[in-house]
């Protein structure tokens, strides 16, 4: 017996549907499309969101909100992510070098999430009150 001799057991695999290949298949003649109408024609699909000429939902509802450009150059960092930074001094550049934040980020804020395992010095990075307390409790300090 070789690999090219192997075949599935009879009846274990069903044949795929081939619409329009005879009435015995159950999908002959109309091929599962029904009789007449737009969806029976070739190319008879409608665009997503089209509601038959009625004003679509996305145009009935008012516009709202905007995309803040500030979000593009700001980032939040968890306490647990500070462990990825090598050395005792954490700056925006050291976070970029450790792939914790994107290269286009300019301002960072440290959030209280996770734990600090070692004393680190934070330079030029903002922090929440809880994160600041946790870093200082671990022996770390902040420098502006």
Curated annotation (Swiss-Prot):
<comment type="function">
    <text>Binds to the 23S rRNA.</text>
</comment>
<dbReference type="InterPro" id="IPR005749">
    <property type="entry name" value="Ribosomal_uL15_bac-type"/>
</dbReference>
<dbReference type="Pfam" id="PF00828">
    <property type="entry name" value="Ribosomal_L27A"/>
</dbReference>
<keyword id="KW-0689">Ribosomal protein</keyword>
<keyword id="KW-0694">RNA-binding</keyword>
<keyword id="KW-0687">Ribonucleoprotein</keyword>
<feature type="region of interest" description="Disordered">
    <location>
        <begin position="1"/>
        <end position="57"/>
    </location>
</feature>
<dbReference type="InterPro" id="IPR021131">
    <property type="entry name" value="Ribosomal_uL15/eL18"/>
</dbReference>
<dbReference type="GO" id="GO:0006412">
    <property type="term" value="P:translation"/>
</dbReference>
<comment type="similarity">
    <text>Belongs to the universal ribosomal protein uL15 family.</text>
</comment>
<dbReference type="InterPro" id="IPR036227">
    <property type="entry name" value="Ribosomal_uL15/eL18_sf"/>
</dbReference>
<feature type="compositionally biased region" description="Gly residues">
    <location>
        <begin position="21"/>
        <end position="31"/>
    </location>
</feature>
<dbReference type="InterPro" id="IPR001196">
    <property type="entry name" value="Ribosomal_uL15_CS"/>
</dbReference>
<dbReference type="GO" id="GO:0003735">
    <property type="term" value="F:structural constituent of ribosome"/>
</dbReference>
<comment type="subunit">
    <text>Part of the 50S ribosomal subunit.</text>
</comment>
<dbReference type="InterPro" id="IPR030878">
    <property type="entry name" value="Ribosomal_uL15"/>
</dbReference>
<dbReference type="GO" id="GO:0022625">
    <property type="term" value="C:cytosolic large ribosomal subunit"/>
</dbReference>
<keyword id="KW-0699">rRNA-binding</keyword>
<dbReference type="GO" id="GO:0019843">
    <property type="term" value="F:rRNA binding"/>
</dbReference>
<protein>
    <recommendedName>
        <fullName>Large ribosomal subunit protein uL15</fullName>
    </recommendedName>
</protein>
């Amino acid at each position: 017996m070789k690999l090219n001799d192997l075949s599935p057991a009879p009846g274990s695999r069903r044949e795929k549907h081939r619409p329009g290949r005879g009435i015995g298949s159950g999908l002959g003649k109309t091929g599962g499309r029904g009789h007449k109408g737009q969806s029976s024609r070739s190319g008879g699909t409608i665009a997503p969101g089209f509601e038959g000429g009625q004003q679509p939902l996305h145009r009935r509802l008012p516009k709202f909100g905007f995309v803040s450009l500030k979000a593009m150059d700001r980032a939040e960092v968890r306490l647990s992510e500070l462990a990825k930074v090598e050395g005792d001094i954490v700056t925006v550049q050291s976070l970029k070098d450790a792939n914790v934040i994107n290269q286009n980020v300019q301002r960072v804020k440290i959030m209280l999430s996770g734990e600090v395992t070692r004393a680190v010095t934070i330079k030029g990075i903002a922090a929440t009150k809880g994160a600041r307390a946790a870093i200082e409790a671990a022996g770390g300090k902040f420098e502006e």
